[in-house]
Structure formats: C-alpha cells, structure tokens
Swiss-Prot record:
Region feature (Disordered): 1-27, 42-79, 169-200
InterPro entries: KfrB
Domain of life: Bacteria
Keywords for this protein: Plasmid
Pfam family, one: KfrB
Biased composition (Basic and acidic residues): 187-200
Protein name: Uncharacterized 22.8 kDa protein in nuc-osa intergenic region
Length: 200
C-alpha cells in the first residue's frame, strides 16, 4: 500500500469519526431540548456541559410558553423548579469550564463523567459544589468529572493533589492517595505470589 493511499484512508477515517462526533452531539442537543420540553430532570450527559444545558433550558422555555396559553399549576411549579435547577447547573458548568481552562487547550475531549468499574489516576485540577475535576493520567488531555456526592473521601481531596478515584461497585467512588493505593496493590501481589508458592 502506498503512502498516498494510507493518507487517504487515514483522512477518510478521520472524516467518519468527525461526522460520528457531530451526529452524536446533535443527538445529545435534541435529547437535552426534548428533556426540557417534557419537564424531565436534567440529563446526566448535560451536567457540566453548557451548550447542552442551554438546549435543555430552551426546551423548558418552550413549555413555559405553552403554559401561558393553557395554565397548569402542577406543570408550572415543576417548570419553576427545573428552571432553578438548570440555572444552578449552568453556573456549575461555568465553574467547571473555569477550573479546566488551563487544561482545555490540551484536551481531546472537554470532559467525561466517571464510569462504573473504572479507576482514574491524576491531578485534581478543580472542585465545585458538585464535582471533583481530575486530569486523567492514562488519557492525556481528558478531563474526568466525579460527582462529589457519590465519592467517598471527596472532601479530603485538595487542589493539585495526585489522587486515585476508583468505582469498584457501580457509581460509588472511593478516593485513595496514590501511595496508599500502590501499597495496597503491592500487598495484594505479595499475597497472590505467596499463595502460589504455598500451594506448591
């Protein structure tokens, strides 16, 4: 295969990936708008993401207009609560953006939410009322948002600390400093090694 052909294939893959990202972003915008229109809770994917929160807010505003023509006290109360929630979420997203500002220039993705079963190691680059924000060492340029309420020990993590945050049991996270985590892995390896020798 020639170098020219390889470059063409590489460009095609890049274009397909970009198109896929754009389609996914458009789908997320539509879902956020529809969630707002249906007076549903703010979608998890929208939290920490200003553009999606703005789409959600637009959906809420459309429902608000409908409520002006056909009043419904329950829907109106729910809309008021969700409007307050989305305003708080937008402020939170702005705080996340500010905290991540230094890292954003290098970031491949603006952010990702922590996933069950994963372990994240890296420097804590920001904290808000709802999130611990971490630069992921294993994926340079990727920022991880950890929900503080779901992370045991989140209050102990300070700015610029190097921390390990793992999710061994679903959405509940555990914070460990890297030295303690390394020590625990070493002990586990010693136990398994000793167990093999003992079994001989």
């Amino acid at each position: 295969m020639t170098d020219t052909r390889r470059e063409q294939e590489k460009d095609e893959r890049r274009k397909l990936q970009e198109q896929s990202r754009q389609n996914e972003a458009e789908t997320m915008r539509l879902l956020a708008f529809e969630a707002g229109r249906q007076l549903a809770e703010i979608p998890k994917e929208a939290k920490g993401n200003e553009p999606l929160l703005e789409n959600y807010k637009s959906g809420l505003q459309e429902t608000r207009k409908e409520l002006e023509t056909t009043p419904d006290a329950t829907k109106s109360t729910n809309a008021n609560r969700l409007e307050r929630d989305v305003e708080r979420a937008i402020i939170e997203a702005q705080q996340v953006r500010e905290a991540v500002g230094r890292e954003k220039a290098r970031a491949d993705e603006f952010h990702r939410h922590a996933e069950p079963g994963e372990t994240y190691r890296g420097r804590v680059i920001g904290r808000t009322n709802s999130y611990v924000i971490q630069a992921d060492d294993s994926r340079p340029g990727t920022i991880i948002l950890h929900e503080r309420a779901a992370v045991s020990g989140a209050e102990k993590v300070k700015m610029n600390d190097h921390a390990e945050i793992s999710y061994p049991h679903g959405r509940a996270g555990i914070v460990r400093n890297p030295q303690a985590a390394q020590h625990q892995r070493q002990r586990q390896m010693e136990k398994t090694g000793a167990g093999r020798e003992h079994g001989r």
